[in-house]
Amino acid sequence: MSHRLAKHALTSVLALIASLNSLSAAETDITIAMQLEPPHLDPTSAAAGAIDNVVYSNVFEGLTRFMGDGSVVAGLAKSWNISADGLRYTFHLQTGVTFHDGSSMTADDVKFSLDRARAEDSTNAQKALFAGIADVEVVDPHTVVVSLQAPNGNLLFNLAWGDAVIVAPETIDGIKSNPVGTGAFTFVNWVQGDKIELARNPNYWGAAPALEAATFKFISDPTAAFAAMMAEDVDAFQSFPAPENLPQFDADPRFKLLIGSTEGETILSTNNKMPPFDNKLVRQALAHAIDRQAIIDGAMFGYGTPIGSHFAPHNPAYIDLTGNSNYDPAKAKALLAEAGFADGFTTTLKLPQPSYARRGGEIIAAQLRAVGIYAEISNLEWAQWLEQVFRGKDYGLTIVSHTEPMDIGIYARPDYYFQYDNPAFQDLMTRLTATSDPVQRTAMLQEAQTVISQEYVNGYLFQLAATSVAKIGVQGMWVNAPTQAIDLTGISWAD
């Protein structure tokens, strides 16, 4: 063999080895794309679902947690006892749990986290989840007692939310940019506008995940999302933003579709304290001006289920109330005239980044214009939407998908961004919280759905479908989305 041929053969062998090493690396690492970049990484102080996409069950954990099928199971609490009167929950914590900085996780951290979430000055977006807690008592390093003001059949469910994760007091100052949790993955790096990197936690208290490293890649543009997936620059895309491309992925043997349900009630949110939306007749007119199916077909290419209230159709307590707000432009015009707006009016329609909002907003604006309502569209980045709409309540209309699980209770919060204030509804939610009987709870949930539907608090559009795309070898990604999360702990590559 000539020197040159031998050199070429050696080069080929080295290239093959490098290729095999690359393949091996790819089978322990994963890159998952998502459309929205989180504003920061503290799930206990903001409503952005993109935060939980990255950190839920990966970096941070709570006493309980959601599984992909929606069930609530043990998390940092390995077990619990409930007193006969339902007022005391004694949680027994997992042993050997450490935070990523090496410090031990104890009952003191649980008390700190729950007290911080329910404090008067708490910035927790779901502070209401903790409102019924009367006291949190440390019994010993691995036992904590949560005392309630009244029985709460939802407590274990509430503690599974991303807003209820356990954090260490000494890490709070840096939590937004350098999160330190107890989860199976540690935070490594955040390149703003590009990606977040996580690595497997070698000291994790539970079962070790199959993945050694994960990268969350942020791709906001639907065209760029399609290009990245087709080029295999990413291994999966959670909630793919261009549903019109899904059939192409389905026909490509390199990929698979993960189509399921979410908790995302997509609504035309209405500022109930801003004239003229403080008038129920105007809100009712809005509801009858909207053709839900046209929005689902035009913006979502058929992926979505019409809803008539703020409740998921796959929930056993769901009732179909879409008939309360059927598409009827003539009725919408008559209601506007009755409300004193025969000539219509102008309002704002502030839209966050997701394609359901941007594409749906264009369709809705045209539908409203047909009955005399002129919606001036303003496209916002997610951080702007949170500041102007969610916190500032400076809007007339907006479109957003509420992806939190079983969140009809937000309508009992008069300070919530759409500012619906109904004492009777608030009383109903209080009674629901104190009720554990499943038959009674179903009846109350159905009453709650009916009340907000008949009050036309918001325009109820559709239940968002889970539409993710992954390479054929990716296993264990959630098909359904019982909460906002990309849970890495069960993801692996096929052998």
What are these regions (language model features)?
Residues E27-I30, V191, A289-A317, S355-A365, ...:
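Detector for C-terminal structural segments
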Residues A33-A84, D115, V180-T182:
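N-terminal lobe/hinge region of extracytoplasmic solute-binding protein
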Residues E37-N53, L76-A77, S103, A125-Q126, ...:
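A structural "hinge/loop" feature
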Residues S79-T123, V139, V145, P276:
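Aromatic- and charge-enriched surface segment that lines or borders ligand/interaction sites
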Residues H92, Q126-P169:
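Surface-exposed binding/hinge segments that line
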Residues T106-S113, P141-S147, G183-A184, L211-A213, ...:
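Alpha-helical secondary-structure segments
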Residues F157-P209, A213, D221-T223, A330, ...:
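Gly/Pro-rich hinge or "lid" segments in bacterial periplasmic/extracellular proteins
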Residues D173, N201-P247, Y374-E376:
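Ligand-site clamp/hinge motif
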